[in-house]
Amino acid sequence: YIKHTLLESYLETLVLTVGMGAKGEAQAEICYVDCFAGPWGSEDENLDGTSIALSLKTLASCKAKLASLGVNARMRDLFIEKDKKAFGRLSTFLKRGTFAEVERECFPGDFVDLRHEILRWCGTNGFTFFFIDPKGWTPVVIEVLRPLLQRRRSEFLINFIYDFINRT
C-alpha cells in the first residue's frame, strides 16, 4: 500500500526529529495512536503489511537510533479497534511481545466514543502522532476530531479515500 510507505517514511522522520529535539532532556516521550487499527488485509499472525506491525517496527527502530545518538526515548503505541474479531487478533498479537521495547495498549470500541480516554492515555507531556485511517466510509469531521486537534504537541495523518470524497 502507498499509504503504508507514506506512513513509515513520515513516521520515522517525525519521530527522529522530535526525539532529537528532546536531546538533553531526561527522556523524550513519543506516542502513536492508531484510531482505526484493524488488523485489515493480513491473515499473517505477524500482521505483516498492517499499520500495527509497521508502527511498532518503526518506533522500535527509531528508539534504537535515538539511543545510539544519546537520546533516551520512551515509545508508546495505542491501538483502537471496534470490530470484535479484529480486536481479538490485535490483542493476541500485542500480547506476544514483538518489539517489546515499545510499550503498547489496545482499547476496544469506536475512537469517537474513546476520545477522552485516548487523551488521558496520551498525557500532556509527550508528543503524540495520530494515524486516522478509517475502514470504509466514516465521517471524520472537525467537530469529531476537535478534542484531539486541541491537544498540544500532536500531529495527524488522516487518510481520505478519494472515491468516497468524490461521491459526496
Question: Language-model segments: what does each one mean?
Answer:
Residues 3:
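Hydrophobic (often cysteine-bearing) scaffold residues that line and stabilize catalytic clefts
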Residues 6:
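Charged catalytic carboxylate motif
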Residues 9-118:
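SAM cofactor-binding core of SAM-dependent methyltransferases
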Residues 32, 128-130:
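Receiver (REC) domain switch-region micro-motif
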Residues 37, 134-135:
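Conserved Walker B
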Residues 78, 131-133:
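Short catalytic-loop micro-motif centered on adjacent basic/acidic residues
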Residues 115, 119-128, 135-168:
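Class I S-adenosyl-L-methionine
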